[in-house]
Regions:
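Short, acidic, small-residue-rich periplasmic hinge/interaction motif at the N-terminus
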Residues: 35-37, 46-50, 78-82, 92, ...
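Short acidic/polar hinge/loop motifs at secondary-structure boundaries
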Residues: 65-67, 185-212
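N-terminal periplasmic accessory domains that precede
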Residues: 97-102, 144-147, 164-169, 181, ...
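Extracytoplasmic beta-strand/coil segments of soluble accessory domains associated
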Residues: 145-186
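Periplasmic-side early beta-strands and strand-to-turn transitions of outer-membrane beta-barrels
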Residues: 236, 245, 262-348
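Face-selective signature of the C-terminal outer-membrane beta-barrel domain
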Residues: 316-339, 358-515, 519-531, 535-539, ...
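Membrane-embedded beta-barrel scaffold of Gram-negative outer-membrane proteins
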Residues: 537, 544-549, 553, 576-636
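Gram-negative outer-membrane beta-barrel transporters
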Residues: 597-606, 628-721
């Protein structure tokens, strides 16, 4: 190397060293350890100098260090599960400062308090309402529907395993009588790839349930009630929540949720999950003998399901701004979900399919806007809008039929149920606008309007080119409401409200006896409903509630148009009308480390044109579901809820519900002849059921920030008739028997819930379980789950 080159290299090296030395003289360093109050190191805690970009994270030993220019700063320490701490520091040029800190474990407590306050707010309202805290279940493999079953008056009915058809029963009202919302946005038309029984419980902060009488803010035509899934809204700088579970029947479930809120208010969040299961559990079922064509219903065989694979995937993305002068929340969202579902049985278990299946997807862009104190103090507005495109393809092209042994027999014509390769294209628009105005401390006025529009077109893919139905199926509805709430003091509050219902329907209606000639038919209807609710916080921890609503429910898309497969629609269905009454008395008290809560409720429903799902016999021994109006249905019921907790280590409670839902029409539908089922129970409705749970908590197992939780829970359903009890022969054969399911869950949370392991055994007595006649659910099953959470 030449002398010149050596000189240049030496000069560059000397310059770098000199500059570094000068920089070091102008900077200082602060280091130390971040500990819990118990003296344990807190890893991955965030440490930063306020108002600067100088930051770091602690290592596994809780150590940190930051280099920054000399000066006075405020240093901030934060970590999930702990209270944020701020301290003044001074960095001096060329000096090292040492600062050890201890953080209080109150961030997790604050989160619990936040959720608890929201739960209490719902429970203390004038409406017959309760809230389920899903945060207690995040380490389990439960779905939102399974969490919902913990609410009083609720019964979840599924036809099988993961991804099976599901119906919610609330106070004797089931299916479409109960409306589902997510953050106050109606979920009609969302599609089967995004339903309560395939959304993980981690997706929600809590589930609110309003029974019978529904606040104007939902804009719902729900005579049964409303379920509102509330997603987390606490502002977190960043977070990652991920889990994976594996269990019986080759069941895989995974979930990931991550997001960030920047200092300028920009926010993004991604939520994704998937479910997969072979659903190949054992059932006891009559089997058709292809040699004789006979089905021996007295001698069921122990057989395994073989055409019941299900999987779905979903991604929910949101981005926008929060806490800005012009918006508290302005978020743009996009949901994508898809599903594949093999269909093992029809509406009865003895009907078995071997190749029938369906698949589909759903796309949904959305807009969410909210602003408190808009233009003037006390004026709050919110707007939610979305568009959903949902495509479902039904495939039934097999040339053979199957029995439960997996044997095949050739069909005279293709199609196990009905020969089809068809696509249903659903388009759904929804918008909800709410204005609240608080006048002083005692008065609140609310105006709400919810609009929903739907159309469906069908393509027959068996033709070349594919052909579309001559007539599209179209509905639109608008529900507008206004309410006034008066709160004279902290002990009393009252609400009165009115709702205007409008619906337009257009679609094909059969005009021939053979159901092969159709004409385009349309209709438009308008109704007005009203109601009131009040509550009184009595002495000694008692609370009394009373509410009433003249409610209407408009026929849904599926009830009028079917599902193009196993459900048959009826455009002539009339809206349901009901007088709904709720009375509730609750008691809440704390005695030292003991907390007691008890609530008893009475409900009454006088319903006209009640829409009931029945089974329709088709040719060839096949069946489908259809919907009919009953003239009058009378419902009376009671529910009791109780919960007790002691200190930090024990919590137990449960719910009991008994409903008396009777056919109250003296004459047969459409005639003057006596109604043979008059005063009989409505068929195919569970009328007595209960659940309970016991939770033990062992805090400090392994280290003080760890907790072991052992949970036992059960569900009981009393037997009920599939048909009206006094009509027909051999009705004892059509009874869903008594059932008692027992489950056990053990979970271990490490470092204030950062790492979590859980193990579940469901139905550990291996009982035969049925939610619907003859459709047997899974026996004993085992599941394991791992979950991690990072953030602050």
């Amino acid at each position: 190397m030449s002398f010149g080159r050596r000189y240049i290299l030496l000069f560059i090296t000397f310059s770098i060293v000199s500059i570094s030395a000068i920089a070091q003289r102008n900077t200082g360093m602060i280091s130390g350890k971040v500990l819990s109050l118990d003296g344990e190191a807190i890893d991955y805690a965030t440490v930063f100098l306020k108002g600067t970009s100088y930051s770091c994270s602690t290592n596994e030993k809780g150590l940190y260090h930051i280099n920054a220019p000399e000066g006075n700063y405020t240093i901030i320490f934060s970590s999930v599960g702990f209270e944020k701490r701020e301290m003044p520091v001074t960095l001096k040029s060329g000096e090292r400062s040492k600062l050890n800190v201890k953080l209080k474990p109150s961030t997790q407590l604050a989160e619990v308090i936040f959720v608890g306050n929201q739960l209490s707010k719902v429970r203390n309202s004038a409406f017959n309402a309760t809230a389920v805290n899903t945060q207690e279940l995040v380490n389990t493999t439960k779905t939102l529907s399974e969490a919902l079953a913990k609410a009083p008056g609720m019964k979840i009915r599924e036809s099988g395993g993961v991804g099976s058809d599901m119906a919610v029963t609330m106070d004797g009202f089931s299916g479409k009588h109960v409306k589902v919302f997510i953050d106050g946005v109606p979920q009609e038309g969302a599609g089967s790839s995004f339903s309560l029984n395939n959304i993980p419980v981690n997706f929600a902060d809590r589930i609110e349930v309003y029974r019978g009488v529904v606040p104007v803010g939902f804009g719902a035509d729900a005579i049964g009630g409303v379920i509102n899934i509330v997603t987390p809204r606490r502002q977190r700088r960043w977070f990652v929540d991920a889990s994976y579970s594996y269990g019986s029947f080759n069941t895989h479930k995974s979930y990931v949720n991550f997001g960030q809120t920047l200092r300028n208010g920009f926010k993004y969040e991604i939520n994704a999950f998937q479910n997969y299961s072979d659903n190949n559990y054992w059932v006891d079922s009559p089997v058709e003998d292809f040699a004789t064509g006979a089905i021996n219903r007295k001698k069921p065989e122990h057989v395994r399901r073989f055409n019941d694979t299900y999987h779905n995937e979903a991604v929910i993305a949101k981005l926008g701004f929060v806490n800005k002068p012009w918006a508290d929340r302005l978020l743009f969202g996009f949901n994508y979900s898809r599903m594949y579902k093999e269909i093992q049985t029809g509406v009865r278990q003895e009907i078995v399919y071997g190749q029938k299946h369906r698949h589909g997807y759903s796309l949904m862009p959305s807009l969410e806007y909210g602003k408190r104190n808009l233009f003037t103090k006390g004026l709050d507005v919110s707007l939610n809008a979305n568009y959903n495109r949902n495509n479902t393809t039904n495939v039934d092209t097999a040339s053979v039929k199957y029995n439960w042994r997996g044997e095949t027999d050739r069909l005279n014509s293709p199609g196990e149920q009905s020969y089809q390769l068809s696509k249903a294209i659903n388009n759904n628009w929804s918008a909800a606008f709410t204005v609240n105005y608080r006048l002083g401390e005692n008065h609140v006025f609310t105006i709400n309007d919810v609009f929903n529009a739907f159309n469906r077109s069908n393509e027959d893919l068996l033709t070349t080119p594919p052909s579309r139905d001559e007539f599209s199926k179209v509905t639109s509805k608008n529900i507008a409401g206004v309410s006034y709430r008066y709160m004279p003091n902290t002990k009393l509050n009252f609400s009165v409200f009115g709702k205007q219902y409008h619906q337009y329907v257009s679609g094909p209606m059969a005009t021939s006896a053979a159901q092969d000639v159709y004409e385009l038919t349309s209709r438009s209807i308008d109704y007005f409903g009203y109601g009131a609710a009040g509550t009184w916080f009595m002495p000694l921890g008692f609370q009394f509630k009373a509410s009433y609503e003249k409610a209407y429910r408009l026929p849904t898309i599926e009830e009028m148009f079917g599902d193009e497969d196993l459900e048959v629609g009826d455009m002539s269905l009339r809206p349901e009308a009901s007088h709904n009454v709720n009375l509730n008395l609750s008691y809440n008290a704390t005695f030292g480390s003991n907390i007691v809560y008890v609530e008893a409720g009475f409900i009454y429903r006088d319903t006209r044109d009640y829409i009931q799902r029945n089974i329709l016999a088709l040719s060839g021994g096949k069946s489908a579901a259809t919907y009919v109006n009953y003239g009058k249905v009378d419902t009376k019921g009671v529910s009791i809820s109780a919960r007790y907790s002691f200190s930090k280590w024990l919590s137990l409670g449960g719910n009991f519900t008994q409903m008396n839902v009777r056919d109250n029409m003296p004459t047969a539908q459409g005639s003057t002849a006596p109604n043979l089922s008059y005063k009989e129970r409505m068929p195919n409705l569970p009328y007595m059921f209960a659940d309970s749970d016991v939770n033990f908590y062992w805090h400090g197992l392994g280290r003080k920030s760890n907790v072991l939780t052992v949970t036992y829970d059960n569900q009981y359903t009393h037997k009920f008739c599939y048909y009206t009890a006094n009509i027909g022969s051999n009705n004892s054969d059509y009874v869903v028997p008594d059932q008692f399911a027992h489950n056990l869950t053990v979970s271990y949370g490490i470092k204030n819930g950062r790492y979590n392991l859980s193990f579940e055994c469901r139905n550990f007595t291996n009982a035969r379980l049925y939610d619907n006649f003859s459709l047997q659910k899974a026996g004993r099953a085992f599941y394991g789950k791992v979950r991690i959470y990072f953030g602050n």
